Amino acid sequence: MNSRLIKTFAVIVIIAAGMTACGQKKNVTTDDVSEKETANIQETAAQEVTAQKIITQEITTEKEPEDDEYVLVKKYIPDIYVELRYATENNFTGVKIYDFTEAYLRYGTVKKLAQVQKELKQQGYSLKIWDAYRPFEAQQKLWEVYPDPNYVANPANGMRRHNLGGTVDITIVAADGSIIPMPSEFDDFSLKADRNYSDIDNEEAVNNVMILQNAMENNGFTGYQGEWWDYSDTVEYEAVDFEP
């Protein structure tokens, strides 16, 4: 064979071998990167799953309050309507009585109220709170404006039902929150406010207030005779310090 041809063939073999070696090296590098990326993705996904499990566990293992603890009503009954009249000027005094706008009650009372709400929602209604926990100072303000023990508890007699977080002033509305006929407005100090509904001409209003009354009484509440909207838990709570 021609020596020049031999040299040329040898060069070609060397170049081909070099290209093959380079190709193999490139493939190994690509595979290595791919494996690292896959491992990183898997590790990140595992970390996210672990974090989610921790969050879920924290939520599901949240300690349930004791029955005598004050709680935010809407936390446990999200679909209830709240319009605290004494947090506005829209009440019989014409002045704001307290500053907070959320309803608070004892947890045991809220559990009962949740059952009432469930029962009413099945009938196309919803509860609406006008007043719940009422600070003692607020009771003093109300007495100064309207010192009539038939409608306002005298603070001189100590802590009363609203001050202990087991009493609620409440009405019912349509499920969408729209107003329906009731015997009177809130804090109406006429005969229309009491539970003798014989003087109420509106039959629908009487029917609605009886729906409220039956639902409340069936779930552990008693109504105050002089005010159709006033209900107290049958369980009485001791006075404790609480600031909304």
Task: Give, region by region, the residue ranges found by the protein language model.
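Segments that shape or occlude catalytic/ligand-binding pockets
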Residues: 135
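Extracytoplasmic cell-surface/polysaccharide-interacting catalytic and binding patches
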Residues: 22-130, 145-244
